[in-house]
Amino acid sequence: MALLVEKTSSGREYKVKDMSQADFGRLEIELAEVEMPGLMSCRAEFGPSQPFKGAKITGSLHMTIQTAVLIETLTALGAEVRWCSCNIFSTQEHAAAAIARDSAAVFAWKGETLQEYWWCTERALDWGPDGGPDLIVDDGGDATLLIHEGVKAEEEYKKNGALPDPSSTDNAEFQIVLTIIRDGLKSDPTKYTRMKERLVGVSEETTTGVKRLYQMQANGTLLFPAINVNDSVTKSKFDNLYGCRHSLPDGLMRATDVMIAGKVAVVAGYGDVGKGCAAALKQAGARVIVTEIDPICALQATMEGLQVLTLEDVVSEADIFVTTTGNKDIIMVDHMRKMKNNAIVCNIGHFDNEIDMLGLETYPGVKRITIKPQTDRWVFPDTNSGIIVLAEGRLMNLGCATGHPSFVMSCSFTNQVIAQLELWNERKTGKYEKKVYVLPKHLDEKVAALHLGKLGAKLTKLTKDQADYISVPIEGPYKPAHYRY
């Protein structure tokens, strides 16, 4: 692939779309900093001691304005950083330009092809002769996946000379991954093994990536320690819930200008993300129907006044369909053929396999009409009616809008900084094995406390008698690890 890495005047590598947007990006970063008190508190608390001095951090996470504040927090604490996005549509060009010019090596632009996406991931992991990063900030697990698949291929190559065969899988994206690994083996047959040996650990941002980590842990194939940031309360109950409540309608309205009030909306899945999406649609005046496999989540939905049905029950009646499950094959092409004309179909789960885009793209005679970037109308020849698909079935809130607002991302990203610090500071103690860990409750509470002042909140203080009565320390943590918020 004929992509060339560029360099700034100071010699920092990058590949972004438009460096002329760097000044614009810097202005928005400065606005976001005011809305991200957790990250700014990390800079104030840890910046003087430079705890990341000597650390090389690779990030694979949406290259947005909010992520820019995270990156510059890591560099303010002493780290060197290389970054790529974890989604082909989520990069904000001005954010990428500002960071590439001022702070870190960035390889990201909006509208990457899948080949370009994995090239960017490979570049973000490439630290030259040193072998790779010390730490990874991951979102969805693609950087982690590339290293694991690379190590597996190198072991096979060393054992019997076998190269990865891209034709061994029907998954077009995984074919690209295997091609990258195969081509790299010829010139450097131990690249990913050296990365594995150097790596201290990874902190994972989202549900889908965490699922991958737990699968590898169960299989005994996890190569380095991992911290599950997603299941911190101040991430999952805020980013996943309140963030989606904000960004779903933002993406819908930017993409389609549709009036949500009066529409019938189907939300597939009623976890934290689904709860936020359903609340947003209900508050906007839609009649919301939930599909669920879990009786507990289904019961929660009914207690919120929502109807719980199957997709087959409502596929021909609804106006808006949103997938939030983190699973695959939720809305198939046969479902889409039965939808009413101009029904809107979108996904807010991490990957693009909740909606059967391959089935849609290969349906005989189907016609794709691009209305604007990331908004396409697909017309079926046998019905002459069409559906509107947002962001090609990928994350619509980042593909069609700018994702979650700065404040809620400050909660998530403060967890990321704390997780990275924890891994780095304990790198020589043996505290973290090749397992998946969750941050302790007192750190979760610390993240929350850092954000209260911005909102004008003031905590009540326990007396010693009160603390003794409920058997908690006066300064916390206030809830047991198993408590459900």
Swiss-Prot record:
One MF annotation (Gene Ontology) recorded for this entry:
adenosylhomocysteinase activity
* Chain's role: Adenosylhomocysteine is a competitive inhibitor of S-adenosyl-L-methionine-dependent methyl transferase reactions; therefore adenosylhomocysteinase may play a key role in the control of methylations via regulation of the intracellular concentration of adenosylhomocysteine.
Stored InterPro entries: Adenosylhomocyst_ase-like_sf, Adenosylhomocysteinase-like, Ado_hCys_hydrolase_NAD-bd, NAD(P)-bd_dom_sf, S-Ado-L-homoCys_hydrolase_CS
Q: CDD domains from the entry?
A: SAHH (cd00401)
Q: Which segments cross the bilayer?
A: none
**UniProt gene name:** SAHH
Q: What biological process terms from GO does the record include?
A: one-carbon metabolic process; S-adenosylmethionine cycle
For this protein, what does the record note about how its cofactor is bound? Binds 1 NAD(+) per subunit.
Q: Which NCBIfam families match?
A: ahcY, PRK05476.2-3
Describe its assembly.
Homotetramer.
> In the UniProt record, which is one GO cellular component term?
cytosol
**Protein's recorded name:** Adenosylhomocysteinase
Q: What is its EC number?
A: 3.13.2.1
Q: Name one Pfam family in it.
A: AdoHcyase
Q: Which UniProt keywords apply?
A: Hydrolase, NAD, One-carbon metabolism, Stress response
Induction or repression: By stress.
